[in-house]
Amino acid sequence: MHQPVMLEETIAMLKPHAKGRYLDGTVGLGGHSFAILQSAGDGAELCGLDQDKKALAIAEMTLKPFKKRVHLVHTKYSSFPLILKALGWKLLDGALIDIGVSSLQLDNAERGFSFLYDGPLDMRMDQDANNNSLFEIVNKSRQEYLKDIISRYGEEPQANRIAKAIVQKRRTKPITTTKELADLIEQAYPAAWRAKSRHHPATKTFQAFRIVVNSELNELEKFLNMIMGWIAPGGRVAVISFHSLEDRIVKQYMKSWTRSCICPPYVPVCKCFHKPEAILITKKPIRPSEKEISENIRSRSAKLRVAEKVLL
């Protein structure tokens, strides 16, 4: 069963209220959205977006008690301006994205997200989308490209060995399943590395492939580049990330929102008169409690960062 990560902490940070309008860009099964509306009380509205149609169908049932105040749309979260304009919304009182993979996706072998189950090489969040599945990337990409994405997005030290093993294997026949790919990656790992690793050797490579299949970092940057322009003064943006690449991007954007001067470093006295858009609510990211991690091991790497829009 999917458990929303850092639910209490997220609601405490967003401070929903009865007259507010909220965006949940990754509504998933509706857990965070339900808590936002329940905490806000009567009158609050929520727009929930998700790429996964199956997740949206469950979210619709979860959020049924708030039906008239919920607007669910099947789309990427970076498309939120189009959706908000269609709703006639001009400003938001809060926005949330939780950029992890849900249990609905991880635990369904047919989706191809996990090396723990044997399924097809898919990994697409939106199964109706035209983007390449993992099958195309694994079986058609050049070795140098595979090495680059495994190294860059998985931060995998054995990227070269893994890319070489993939190319050698597919010369005889296409790689078709997650188990086949995971076993191949494990065999490519040096025995000494396998012995000392705390995680399955395929963990970082599967992360890298998922990021590429779904253009996850590009999607995140698009969202962060636009969202602060849609937040009302006093409204907050909350982002839950699960690995260092995502968190680094979130941290950089939130830092840029709080910057009071954007003059080049060689200018001795500020002449830009730039005003910060936001203040940081979380100087350091909020992490899950030990209790939550013990109840939901998948939350262990989560980080919550929050910024609040200021009156310009």
From Swiss-Prot:
S-adenosyl-L-methionine binds at residues 30-32, 50, 80, 98, 105. It comes from the Bacteria. Its EC number is 2.1.1.199. GO terms for molecular function: rRNA (cytosine-N4-)-methyltransferase activity. It catalyses: cytidine(1402) in 16S rRNA + S-adenosyl-L-methionine = N(4)-methylcytidine(1402) in 16S rRNA + S-adenosyl-L-homocysteine + H(+). The keyword Coiled coil does not apply. GO terms for cellular component: cytoplasm. One of its GO terms (biological process) is rRNA base methylation. It is found in: Cytoplasm. Keywords: Cytoplasm, Methyltransferase, rRNA processing, S-adenosyl-L-methionine, Transferase. The keyword Cytoplasm applies. Specifically methylates the N4 position of cytidine in position 1402 (C1402) of 16S rRNA. Belongs to the methyltransferase superfamily. RsmH family. This is Ribosomal RNA small subunit methyltransferase H. It comes from Lawsonia intracellularis (strain PHE/MN1-00). The gene is rsmH.
